């Protein structure tokens, strides 16, 4: 029997969750929780508390919570690269950075064609080690989540591909209003990108688009609308090994099938900004919900590992 924490809208969802399972509230105390990334080697989760300018570590072994970085350059989205290093989107730093194995911070990308990036928002690492990220203006729109500043790129909020070996930074998409969360399909033939442009444009997008990755693995092809958000907006999201999309929304986590059908919801009593799969079997979803960190076990596994 499913608890009231789940809402089944399509019977396929009933197979992706468990009976007698509840959402757990693990910790509270953030102003805007974002950017969860799970480190399987250390069994901990790193996530952002953007307005409080800190990153937080949840230790899965004893459920303790501690400060990881403070100040933290108003970091937003995170990912873990193929070498197990933390990749961070920095609002205040207006860059994508990496924590090296020796603990030092290295800026990987801060400018495009001589102009400062806006405020990198969310990031994913492809299996070839390249780093793909979005660069909307949220971190420079005000002093709340970074330092207010005028965009040097004009109104352009691009999606970028960074080769961390050569440092080459290329625009892979420039037709989003405010690109936000992003994630590849399990075979990396598709890239899903959220657009939260409704925040800046009347009746603007609050949807996810799906974009074909060209055969070169470096550029993007045609795109189409994947799903509109029915409550709030889609911010960050992850895919499971079967290609289902588990995405943040205004009323919790929405699970979408590959055809875009809303299969069901994990209900969270706060706006959710982002999530990631964790746990030793990567079947535990960690959920950043505004003031709190939540988690829930599901009958699905994260597609990318670590992430
Ligand atoms: Mg985001």
Task: Specify the residue positions occupied by each region the protein language model found.
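Sequence-structural signature of mature extracellular/luminal beta-sheet repeat domains
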Residues: 1-307
């Amino acid at each position: 029997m499913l608890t009231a924490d789940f809402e089944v809208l399509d019977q396929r969802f009933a197979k992706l969750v468990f009976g007698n399972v509840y959402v757990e509230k693990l910790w509270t105390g953030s102003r805007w929780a974002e950017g969860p990334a799970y480190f399987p080697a250390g069994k901990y989760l790193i996530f952002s508390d953007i307005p409080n300018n800190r990153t937080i570590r949840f230790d899965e072994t004893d459920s303790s919570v501690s400060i990881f970085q403070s100040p933290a350059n108003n970091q937003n989205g995170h990912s873990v690269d193929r070498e197990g290093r933390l990749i961070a989107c920095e609002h205040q730093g207006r860059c994508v950075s990496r924590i090296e194995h020796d603990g030092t911070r290295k800026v990987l990308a801060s400018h495009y064609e001589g102009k400062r990036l806006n405020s990198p928002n969310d990031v994913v690492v492809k299996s070839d080690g390249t780093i793909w990220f979005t660069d909307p203006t949220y971190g420079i729109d005000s002093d709340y989540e970074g330092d207010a500043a005028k965009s040097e790129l004009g109104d352009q909020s691009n999606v970028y591909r960074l080769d961390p070996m050569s440092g080459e930074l290329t625009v892979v998409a420039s037709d989003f209003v405010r690109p936000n969360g992003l994630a590849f399909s399990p075979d990396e033939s598709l890239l899903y990108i959220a657009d939260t442009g409704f925040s800046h444009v009347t009746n603007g997008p609050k949807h996810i688009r799906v974009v074909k990755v060209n055969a070169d693995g470096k550029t993007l092809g045609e795109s189409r609308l994947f799903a509109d958000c029915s409550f709030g907006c889609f911010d960050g999201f992850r895919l499971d090994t079967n290609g289902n999309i588990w995405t943040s929304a205004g009323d919790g986590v929405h699970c979408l099938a590959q055809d875009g059908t809303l299969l069901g919801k994990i209900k969270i009593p706060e706006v959710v900004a982002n999530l990631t799969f964790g746990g030793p079997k990567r079947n535990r979803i960690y959920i950043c919900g505004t003031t709190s960190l939540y988690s829930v076990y599901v009958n699905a596994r994260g597609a990318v590992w670590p992430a």
